[in-house]
Amino acid sequence: MTSNRKNENEIINAVSNHSAQMDLLPDARIEDSLCIAEGNNIDPFVSASTVQTGINIAGRILGVLGVPFAGQLASFYSFLVGELWPRGRDQWEIFLEHVEQLINQQITENARNTALARLQGLGDSFRAYQQSLEDWLENRDDARTRSVLHTQYIALELDFLNAMPLFAIRNQEVPLLMVYAQAANLHLLLLRDASLFGSEFGLTSQEIQRYYERQVERTRDYSDYCVEWYNTGLNSLRGTNAASWVRYNQFRRDLTLGVLDLVALFPSYDTRTYPINTSAQLTREVYTDAIGATGVNMASMNWYNNNAPSFSAIEAAAIRSPHLLDFLEQLTIFSASSRWSNTRHMTYWRGHTIQSRPIGGGLNTSTHGATNTSINPVTLRFASRDVYRTESYAGVLLWGIYLEPIHGVPTVRFNFTNPQNISDRGTANYSQPYESPGLQLKDSETELPPETTERPNYESYSHRLSHIGIILQSRVNVPVYSWTHRSADRTNTIGPNRITQIPMVKASELPQGTTVVRGPGFTGGDILRRTNTGGFGPIRVTVNGPLTQRYRIGFRYASTVDFDFFVSRGGTTVNNFRFLRTMNSGDELKYGNFVRRAFTTPFTFTQIQDIIRTSIQGLSGNGEVYIDKIEIIPVTATFEAEYDLERAQEAVNALFTNTNPRRLKTDVTDYHIDQVSNLVACLSDEFCLDEKRELLEKVKYAKRLSDERNLLQDPNFTSINKQPDFISTNEQSNFTSIHEQSEHGWWGSENITIQEGNDVFKENYVTLPGTFNECYPTYLYQKIGESELKAYTRYQLRGYIEDSQDLEIYLIRYNAKHETLDVPGTESLWPLSVESPIGRCGEPNRCAPHFEWNPDLDCSCRDGEKCAHHSHHFSLDIDVGCTDLHENLGVWVVFKIKTQEGHARLGNLEFIEEKPLLGEALSRVKRAEKKWRDKREKLQLETKRVYTEAKEAVDALFVDSQYDRLQADTNIGMIHAADKLVHRIREAYLSELPVIPGVNAEIFEELEGHIITAISLYDARNVVKNGDFNNGLTCWNVKGHVDVQQSHHRSDLVIPEWEAEVSQAVRVCPGCGYILRVTAYKEGYGEGCVTIHEIENNTDELKFKNREEEEVYPTDTGTCNDYTAHQGTAGCADACNSRNAGYEDAYEVDTTASVNYKPTYEEETYTDVRRDNHCEYDRGYVNYPPVPAGYVTKELEYFPETDTVWIEIGETEGKFIVDSVELLLMEE
């Protein structure tokens, strides 16, 4: 095995002739001290044999993962038998001895003998099975060989079941660990044969399933056992000094090679998950022994006894923290020199810098040890080359027998090869002067031998050099080499006929928020972790095959939270789905916490050098997501057809109950039925035409059942606001008509659009845009009539939302149940790689590859709160108590958006009977119903009183009951006061959506109509245009500097200077009487004057002084808040024709009013009261602010003699503030 390499502890005699100048006695003693001490060292043969066998077996397994060819399998089993039961010394005993030496613990004699005897029996049985398998593979039709194989298989598998506990004896677990791992590997490979050949050599389908389930179970158990006892043994060796670190590192390396590497391959034996050839990769690092003199008689001559650093210091210096897999590109070595005499000197490795690069990533440079030396550094370049072997010489510079020696490395040969170009190979050397009694050769192949000696080592090497640390002390300069397995290739090459596993640490860069964490032991390397949304880093791949080949993505993960996993290729998202957590927060990373999942939607690569990106979104809370690897899985036409048919059959069958295949499940939504129909429609006519027809009939029947149970009218949105012919629309029955109309389809605001089915919806859906004013929301509603409802029953509203923001959903009966939903969506379900997601006739091509949403999660947001839903489904329940056809309370279904950013696209709406109410739910709805009726009785008494007061106030405004003439003394304040009383009538409209009339709508609109008439008549009497300055200075003539300012939400004219003047010419009727009324406020000294006059004479004026006591105008004066917004940009002719232009529009039955109602709901809980709706009051004068304190109102009577008068406003000094100017025609 090692005949072509020098022994690890070979001593190179490097003594020069000048050594004779020194005293012979000291020299003799020194040279004697350099003799190898055999007592306390690992047996070289045992160590090399153990490592060689572990590397050989792992290397061969990597070549037969998935479903190997029959010839491969026969050859592989022959190889295993030869490796584990060779002629000569027992390999299993070598395993035991090696671990015993590493941990310095002897296994008991009884346990040893029992284990070895059982292993010998297993070897004999396995060899017989292997020979029978070969015989059968050569002639599978031979009944005799098939029968023999069947019998031997069952017996051998049972032998392994009985034997495994003998390799896990209590308190002997660690020394037996390598034996256990190799035996477990054989057992799992044997179990795999049941899936590979079981049906052919006589196993029943039930037996095959049982063996498969045992394989899955034992894979988990064996993996966790090996990792647990590996960690136990390793931790037991953790010490405080350098000597303990040497053993610790040897255990870590050798049991990684002999135990953990096998464990990492166990999952790939699953032929159902990996039905074709599979490429796995090991990215873990192992560390060869430090390059320092060891095994020397004199203790100080061993580097780890020569005042070496502590255990923790060595570990920190030699072992990198978890990182992305990278490749060594350049090494620069810095040297130092020490001299005792001309014959005793050494120049040695003191420090270095390393340049390395992850696959497709940037160059990283790190510095180790001391680099501030005066000796010229040596630079070695290894770009695209693997250093597969190092031959390092550990030197000891002796300073006499009474002084501590210096340990250093004066010479290293780095043997390299280019894996892409085998002729590019050679040696890079670091060589420095050395004169001292001896050197020790440290050959890396002694610790990491090639996989075979049948080929040159530059072809069969097992590991490549990846990194170098250095242990540094004043007299210790010891490099430590780090190695990665050769299976981790440089290019992430993807083959068209194999499943390619790519560990996530092969990403080209590490995004912010992603960390590399130490692997749990069974993953074959480190893994990536995220605790928030974001990417895991791009993986650059090389496609070795036609770009037309389609692939799927699989991945292995563990998570403490639910999350959405996205996969993109070259910037285009090709897969996404929501995955559930696999573990609880704080749990240890065990094998069972990792699960393997695969997307079903295939994709193609667009270029030979491409990039795969993965990311997570929508974490269900604070937690951790770990990703081990992704898998690139080739897709074949037969696989797709069979998979699609199986998935469609399962989906169709899942629509119906288990007890009655003609009865639809309650939780099957209308949207889900549409998606199942798409699944069936996309089945291949070529492979499964008959099955497709049968499934289509079933899914059509399911759709009919869904339509029959849906209580909504027109759920497919054929129209909105369609007037039924039989509905009355005359004024006397207007509110009854609204209720009747709402029970016959959808009603909504004009900005809602109905759109035909797309890649999300199979049928019509609606789009609700945002609004610029929350008092004029976008809305959609329908009423479920009382006749459709059953007493004491729970009903459910549900549907599908493609995307939404600020979408409010209400169910209203006794009170409102309410949700506000933000559902993130995408622009399209189709990846950019799909050039034409449109069918031949323009319809969406729902069979094209598309993003995979998860529509099957229920909406979980309750309590009226606004939240983001990662489910596109929503549902909302409401309970119905006693039904009354005369009262026809029904259930109102309302969708509303009241923000500018809001929007929604939704469809497949359903209102279905969920279940009868029983127990506590029944009691709750009865209590809610009683509260509602008690509240209604109180409301009726209150309404009667308020209506009487309001009607008296309204009637007092007019001359008689014809409501066509105002009383002579009616002013705007009186109108506002009456309007306030009218608005005290509650439940005129539903507070959730004021377009829907409430129980008091008729009486409210009756009185409100009279208020509107009063305002109109009052406007007609005032001939001053823009007298309240709500339109600024429009219609006024201005001289000097004046301004209109907002004060207390009112518009005031401010005249700050005595030379300024504001005037307006007003048309009047000669001979008629007018009242000039001014409300104003004077600041400072002087007077404010408002003058009215004709051309030559007939002048009168009102004067205002600071702090004068006058009759204050009623504080209810004001105007419509909406007046400025509606008329502010109008010209003089339009804006000033009427003081309250636009008032009637503001007071009509506004079908777009909004709501400020957000009750809190638990499941089955109802509120006792409804809040007032602030938008309802914004529609009129009721919120117009009163005149602030300090303003006074003065008036005078004026009788013009011509048809034009002038009103002029000015002051003598100080500041004059005018709130309003009115010129009112006197009533006769």
UniProtKB/Swiss-Prot annotation:
Residues 423-434 have a biased composition (Polar residues). Residues 423-458 are annotated as: Disordered. Signal peptide: none annotated. Keywords: Sporulation, Toxin, Virulence. Toxic segment of the protein is located in the N-terminus. This is Pesticidal crystal protein Cry1Ba. PANTHER family: ENDOTOXIN_N DOMAIN-CONTAINING PROTEIN-RELATED, PESTICIDAL CRYSTAL PROTEIN N-TERMINAL DOMAIN-CONTAINING PROTEIN. One of its GO terms (biological process) is sporulation resulting in formation of a cellular spore. Pfam families: Cry1Ac_D5, Cry1Ac_dom-VII, Endotoxin_C, Endotoxin_C2, Endotoxin_M, Endotoxin_N. Belongs to the delta endotoxin family.
